[in-house]
């Protein structure tokens, strides 16, 4: 049975996601970890994966026609649902009539979840990283987080220091994932006065320069490596222990499309080193 990430306060979240030598390496489910019978951005898919191991759930937030926040990666319904056309041209009631489709094009019984539903389900189980699509106002996402009192289980994904600064000004207690490809990126974040303990660094889809990793770790900032795509393919070819090597070389969180395989490698790494966390049980 998978262990849960049990966080009660936003301070627990800062503590759990601050780098130290004993940090607990984690798998992040890219788009929620779709697999056969389990579509992307579906609560049932999150639950399936969370039953196997402690997970971060990366998911995508869009607006319906009537301004409901729903989980959907594409701006159209065609690829992942039984519907057609734009997400933003359908009301929530219309979206709820559709079924989600898995990556093999199989229709599942599952429905498009709202952000509310996801946060209500995930509290005390998982950490969400929310990829907020471009026309969605940060304010509306923050309102839902506040209503659900889900501050302890959410990280907001940003793609520039400007976006990170905006989120921090709107909600100074929320954790932020920011793109950090070099030391200049880190300097720009520091200029926005975002404290290190409220940051995760997305270092990109190739391993970060060791010097950058060291500086981030010295700041207590954990590094997310995007293995989705190229590095996942390498691991499938060379053997899944490659995932543990990424961790050994300074990644802390792996955003992957192979959560089972990455999770097995990380579990082995964790056991071998006797890593524990009071927040994972």
Give, region by region, the residue ranges found by the protein language model.
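Phosphate-group recognition and catalysis centered on beta-loop-alpha active-site segments
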Residues: 1-281
């Amino acid at each position: 049975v998978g262990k849960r990430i049990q966080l009660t306060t936003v301070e627990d979240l800062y503590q759990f996601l601050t780098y130290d030598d004993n940090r607990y390496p984690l798998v992040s489910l890219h788009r929620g970890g779709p697999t056969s019978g389990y579509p992307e951005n579906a609560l049932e898919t999150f639950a399936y994966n969370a039953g196997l191991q402690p997970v971060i759930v990366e998911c995508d937030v869009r607006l319906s026609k009537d301004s409901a926040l729903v989980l959907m990666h594409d701006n159209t319904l065609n690829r992942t649902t039984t519907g057609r056309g734009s997400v933003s041209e359908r009301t929530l009631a219309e979206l709820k009539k559709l079924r989600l489709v898995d990556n093999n094009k199989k229709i599942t019984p599952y429905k498009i979840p709202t952000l509310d539903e996801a946060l209500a389900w995930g509290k005390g189980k998982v950490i969400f990283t929310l990829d907020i699509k471009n026309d969605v106002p940060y304010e509306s996402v923050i309102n839902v987080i506040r209503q659900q009192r889900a501050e302890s289980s959410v990280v907001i994904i940003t793609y520039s220091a400007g976006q990170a600064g905006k989120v921090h000004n709107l909600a100074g207690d929320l954790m932020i994932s920011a793109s950090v490809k070099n030391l200049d990126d880190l300097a720009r974040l520091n200029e926005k006065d975002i404290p290190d303990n409220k940051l995760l660094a997305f270092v990109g889809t190739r391993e970060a320069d060791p010097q950058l990793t060291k500086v981030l770790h010295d700041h207590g900032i954990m590094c997310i490596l995007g293995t989705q795509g190229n590095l996942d393919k390498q691991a499938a070819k060379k053997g899944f222990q490659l995932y543990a090597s990424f961790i050994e070389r300074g990644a802390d969180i792996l955003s992957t499309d192979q959560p089972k395989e990455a999770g097995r490698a990380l579990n082995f790494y964790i056991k071998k080193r006797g890593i524990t966390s009071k927040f994972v049980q």
